């Protein structure tokens, strides 16, 4: 199981895989782009948060927190760090990655083979999608929902139907890179 240590957000972007149109057009990339970060401030989180997904939009932090029986989606005020609202997730699901898509949040489940479209204004589930395998990380690249599943495969899914359009394999020196998780588009 992938553990998360600490109870505060130190920085939002620790590691990312950039999927630009240019890099997707080529079959291989010789060298990954190195990016830095700067800690601007920290925001304390609840001790029980097991952060799986994190998005910042319009002055709010949207956080999915996983664990069977206590998974939830939380909106946190970016300035004060106060919780605006929580949406508990059914106890049978382990919440995973999230991404903002228009006026909704797409949230994956780890082994539940479900993704939920959640109305961002009231945190109600408006649609659910079934998929095969595990859900780990997700982002929206402007055209597709880009999803990882803990393997070396990344799928590009239709944002309306969640159907797979195509997949790519992440490799390093010709070898598959397993455990691809968090994605930033």
Language model regions located:
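Surface loop/turn motifs at the tips and blade-to-blade linkers of beta-strand repeat domains
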Residues: 42-47, 87-91, 127-132, 169-175
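Conserved beta-strand positions in repeat-built beta-propeller and related beta-rich domains
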Residues: 62-68, 105-112, 147-151
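A short helix->beta-strand "capping" segment at the edge of beta-propeller domains
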Residues: 28-47, 81
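Short loop/turn segments that connect beta-strands within beta-propeller blades
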Residues: 77-81, 119-123, 159-162
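Beta-strand-rich domains and repeat architectures in extracellular enzymes and scaffolds
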Residues: 40-72, 88, 92-99
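Blade-loop segments of beta-propeller domains
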Residues: 81-117, 125-135
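Short coil/turn segments that connect the beta-strands within blades of beta-propeller domains
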Residues: 58-59, 102-103, 142-143
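Repeated scaffold domains used in trafficking and secretory/extracellular systems
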Residues: 49-53, 93-99, 133-140, 177-182
